[in-house]
Amino acid sequence: GFALGDGFACIDLDHCMDASHRLLPWAKMILAPVEGKTYVEVSPSGDGLHIWGTCAERKGVRTRDLMNAEAYSQGRYMTVTMKPYGNAVDRLADITLIYDVIERLATP
């Protein structure tokens, strides 16, 4: 696993795939800005994704109403599966935009 902080962040999309392992529409929208630009892996559940990247440290956020998404950049330990998803690359991109979207939709 990996302890987030020092500029490293992770977006955790839970239950974002259908039975055929195709992304649900909301997950496609979240992934689109960084697809092919940052490392993305299948989460331990097998039907979720971890989008790894860089972002300034900020409060963790979660939304459950419109989508099952969480965003963390500090004080959180994330499991690393090393199961790349799609055209995942071996580098990290800035995921601040995705973090911002999840924060705006966050469940209070």
Where are these regions (language model features)?
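Signature for HUH/AEP ssDNA processing cores
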Residues: 1-46, 56, 85, 107-108
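Residue-level detector of buried hydrophobic side-chain packing
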Residues: 11, 50-51, 80
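Helical (often loop-to-helix) elements that flank the catalytic cores of nucleotide-handling enzymes
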Residues: 20-34, 53-79, 86-95
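Long, charge-rich alpha-helical interaction segments
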Residues: 99-108
